[in-house]
């Protein structure tokens, strides 16, 4: 019996330069490539219009504000793909997919490695663990995930580009999930429990990945790279290979001489998140002033040219004094390092976190402008996201099915906010919740 080849698309609903640096895209493509009766293609905003007469279209949702692109893509493709099922997955789906439930046929909640859930969905088998579909009569869905991270489903072949966030590099995922307790962090919740890869596996993957992709750079991927038990040994191995090492994130309290000597970073990134020690303790961001001071000493010792600090404002219990301490901490760093930048954005109360029912602080915009003004005179550059974009992120993160009618005709964050404001619904999604929202039906 001859099996019919099925055409399957994986779409990253944004530009190529963002999608090519997304490990999930490579994981999905590699995972589906093992099925011989599937013809799999990867697409981005620039080329999705080539998709015609496909059987299944998977869209990975990494960021809430990509929903606008995703909805447009679905509307465009349904015309030329009348028999296709549209499937969503990714961190946003684990967080809360209900605002976009109307637009997709199926949601896969969780991590697909070690399972055949994608193949089952392609074959129209929806009544399986980890799958939510409007064609099924069930209101709850339980996340699926591999108990251990192995090399079996890891994408050694990864098409690369200088345009990507990491340039031409091999993406090496050290671990998934985070052992820290930060109360605001979505990743801690949706990727629990934290799992790290074996050192031998990482060495093998690095060697093969560099050889197969003909690159001389390895980007280390994990919520907190420095928390990996064998990080120094791994970096020594990569250094001996003669490749450049690019860590995605390092905590101030995990830095040491050995790590700095190997990494030789030109820019050191530190995320205190809050300016005062009191507020950091409250959000369980366990970084002390002495940890930051030690990181700055190491930066000076190893010739770091620039330090970038990441902060949030609008944190519950925050006071004017906390804002002043944020400013003073940044000034202290500037006295030690010539070039200092900070990124400051409002805290988004995310589903499944300790702050999921808290209100979004609309006064954050004024706080950010105040910080910018105070630091500009010190020669410190202050970066921040578009405020409407952050408001929209909160709305979409905590929204319900009623948002779909607004998303149906809203082309961007500003138009969605305007529509909700007109119908006096902004406070429903930005204000304090009395209880958990619809995301309580997603069991992590």
From Swiss-Prot:
Gene Ontology molecular function terms on file: 4 iron, 4 sulfur cluster binding; catalytic activity; metal ion binding
Cofactor binding note of this UniProt entry: Binds 1 [4Fe-4S] cluster. The cluster is coordinated with 3 cysteines and an exchangeable S-adenosyl-L-methionine.
Gene3D superfamilies attached to this UniProt entry: tm_1862 like domain (3.80.30.20)
The entry's keywords: 4Fe-4S, Iron, Iron-sulfur, Metal-binding, S-adenosyl-L-methionine
SUPFAM superfamilies: Radical SAM enzymes
Keyword Metal-binding (UniProt): yes
Sequence positions that bind [4Fe-4S] cluster: 178, 182, 185
SMART domains on file: Elp3 (SM00729)
Protein name: Uncharacterized protein MJ0966
Taxonomic classification: Archaea, Methanobacteriati, Methanobacteriota, Methanomada group, Methanococci
């Amino acid at each position: 019996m001859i099996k019919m080849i099925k055409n399957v698309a994986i779409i990253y609903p944004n530009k190529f330069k963002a999608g090519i640096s997304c490990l999930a895209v490579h994981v999905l493509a590699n995972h589906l490539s093992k099925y011989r009766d599937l013809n799999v293609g990867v697409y981005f905003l620039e080329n999705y219009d080539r998709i015609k007469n496909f059987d299944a279209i998977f869209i990975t949702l990494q960021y809430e504000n990509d929903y606008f692109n995703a909805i447009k893509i679905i509307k465009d493709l349904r015309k030329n793909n009348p028999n296709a099922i549209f499937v969503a997955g990714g961190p946003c789906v684990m967080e809360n997919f209900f605002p976009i439930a109307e637009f997709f046929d199926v949601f896969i909640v969780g991590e697909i490695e070690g399972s055949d859930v994608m193949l089952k969905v392609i074959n129209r088998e929806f009544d399986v663990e980890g799958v939510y579909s409007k064609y099924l009569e069930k209101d709850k869905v339980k996340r699926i995930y591999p108990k251990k991270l192995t090399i079996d489903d890891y994408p050694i072949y990864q098409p690369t580009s200088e345009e990507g966030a990491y340039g031409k590099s091999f993406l090496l995922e050290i671990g998934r999930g985070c052992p820290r307790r930060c109360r605001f962090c979505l990743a801690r919740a949706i990727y629990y429990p934290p799992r790290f890869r074996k050192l031998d596996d990482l060495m093998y993957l690095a060697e093969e990945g560099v050889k197969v992709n003909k690159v001389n750079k390895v980007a280390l991927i994990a919520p907190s790279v420095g928390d990996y038990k064998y990080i120094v040994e791994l970096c020594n191995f990569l250094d001996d290979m003669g490749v450049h090492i690019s860590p995605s994130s390092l905590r101030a309290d995990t830095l040491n001489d050995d790590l700095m000597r190997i990494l030789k970073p030109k820019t050191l990134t530190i995320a205190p998140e809050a300016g005062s020690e009191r507020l950091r303790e409250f959000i369980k961001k366990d970084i002390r002033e002495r940890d930051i001071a030690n990181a700055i000493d190491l930066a000076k010792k190893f010739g770091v040219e620039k330090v970038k600090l990441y902060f949030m404002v609008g944190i519950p219990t925050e006071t004017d004094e906390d804002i002043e301490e944020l400013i003073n901490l940044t000034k202290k760093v500037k006295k030690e390092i010539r070039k200092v930048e900070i990124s400051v954005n409002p805290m988004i109360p995310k589903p499944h976190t300790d702050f999921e029912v808290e209100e979004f602080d609309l006064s954050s915009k004024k706080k950010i402008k105040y910080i910018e003004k105070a630091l500009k005179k010190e020669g410190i550059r202050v970066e921040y996201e578009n405020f409407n974009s952050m408001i929209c992120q909160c709305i979409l993160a905590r929204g319900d099915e009623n948002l779909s009618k607004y998303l149906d005709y809203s082309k961007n964050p500003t138009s969605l906010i305007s529509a909700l404001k007109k119908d006096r619904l902004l406070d429903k999604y930005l204000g304090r919740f009395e209880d958990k929202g619809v995301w309580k039906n997603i069991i992590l």
